[in-house]
Amino acid sequence: VNGGYVMPAWYDILGPDLVSQQDAAGIQASERAIVALIAQEVARGIPAERIVLAGFSQGCAMALHTALRLPQKLAGIMALSGYLPLADRLTAERHPANGSTPVFMAHGTQDPVVVIARGEASRDALAALGQPVEWHSYPMPHSLHPREISDISAFLARVLGPAA
């Protein structure tokens, strides 16, 4: 996908459509690293209920994948310009701890990297499982939009509330 060049990534992209072939082993290895990071923060005194797992692009994919399988309740999930990987496994692997955790999803209408249809399909898959999803689209490519930043701020204020 990257012309054969090595670059940092959460997992390998095996095809241009992102989902017909997926690097399950790489996704699961990154999931373990994220779970370990969350455990480290909890051990430092941050309650899991005060953590929002967020990511952009592949980070979005990892935030969705990991949070929905996590046995600790999180404050929220923020999924920006990405998609739900290994969606066909979610029903079997989903943990109920985050079944009602709010998900903020945002995507650019002109995204050439992760086309908006991929994000919409992910949104629809989550909604079909009863996951509360707040969807936003913005006139942008694979990037951030000023209005998106404002919407993110409002979401974080809602799910985190006042500082403890």
Predicted regions mapped to residue ranges:
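A short beta-to-alpha transition loop/helix N-cap that caps and shapes the active-site region
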Residues: 1-2, 84-89, 113
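Serine-hydrolase catalytic machinery in alpha/beta-hydrolase-like enzymes
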Residues: 1-52
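Short aromatic-enriched loop/helix-cap "lid" or pocket-rim segments at secondary-structure transitions
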Residues: 1-5, 91-92, 147-150
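Primarily recognizes the serine-hydrolase "nucleophile elbow" in alpha/beta-hydrolase
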Residues: 47-98
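Short, proline-enriched alpha-helix->beta-strand connector loops that line the catalytic pocket
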Residues: 49, 98-103, 129-132
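A structural signal for isolated positions on well-ordered beta-strands in alpha/beta enzyme cores
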Residues: 52, 78, 102-104, 134-136
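Short beta-strand/loop motif that positions the catalytic acidic residue
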Residues: 104-107, 111
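C-terminal catalytic histidine-bearing segment of alpha/beta-hydrolase fold enzymes
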Residues: 117-164
